[in-house]
UniProtKB/Swiss-Prot annotation:
It comes from Oncorhynchus masou. Its main location: mitochondrion. It catalyses: a ubiquinone + NADH + 5 H(+)(in) = a ubiquinol + NAD(+) + 4 H(+)(out). Belongs to the complex I subunit 3 family. The keyword Aminoacyl-tRNA synthetase does not apply. This is NADH-ubiquinone oxidoreductase chain 3. Core subunit of the mitochondrial membrane respiratory chain NADH dehydrogenase (Complex I) that is believed to belong to the minimal assembly required for catalysis. Complex I functions in the transfer of electrons from NADH to the respiratory chain. The immediate electron acceptor for the enzyme is believed to be ubiquinone. Keywords: Electron transport, Membrane, Mitochondrion, NAD, Respiratory chain, Translocase, Transmembrane, Transmembrane helix, Transport, Ubiquinone. InterPro entries: NADH_UbQ/plastoQ_OxRdtase_su3, NDAH_ubi_oxred_su3_sf. It is found in: Mitochondrion membrane. Its EC number is 7.1.1.2.
Length: 116
């Protein structure tokens, strides 16, 4: 227990010291070269901000939903060892049906189309 306390104390102290140094060092000698963006030795050609596609964001959200579905269905084989394996099958089928209906709805609304 004493070893864990020592390690946590050292970690917190070292993190605080490094964070303080990282904020303090750039303020010692600021100049234009340090404050400008670096593009392989060339002057920046354009804005660093690019427009973000909303469709990409929607597809990323759909991916996260289906990834979460897989995480929910992974323990399904162990559900057979419960007292009521039929109930486990019913709930997993309900989750799959709900997500399939959501995917069909998104598809029919055109949310998965890249071209407008």
């Amino acid at each position: 227990m004493n070893l864990i306390t020592t390690i946590i104390t050292i970690t917190i102290t070292l993190s605080a010291v490094l964070a303080t140094i990282s904020f303090w060092l750039p303020q010692i000698s600021p100049d234009a070269e340090k404050l400008s963006p670096y593009e392989c030795g060339f002057d920046p050609l354009g804005s660093a901000r690019l427009p973000f596609s909303l469709r990409f964001f929607l597809i990323a959200i759909l991916f996260l939903l289906f990834d979460l579905e897989i995480a929910l269905l992974l323990p399904l084989p162990w559900g057979d060892q419960l007292n009521t394996p039929a109930l486990t099958l019913v709930w997993s089928t309900a989750v799959l049906a709900l997500l399939t209906l959501g995917l069909i709805y998104e598809w029919t609304q055109g949310g998965l189309e890249w071209a407008e």
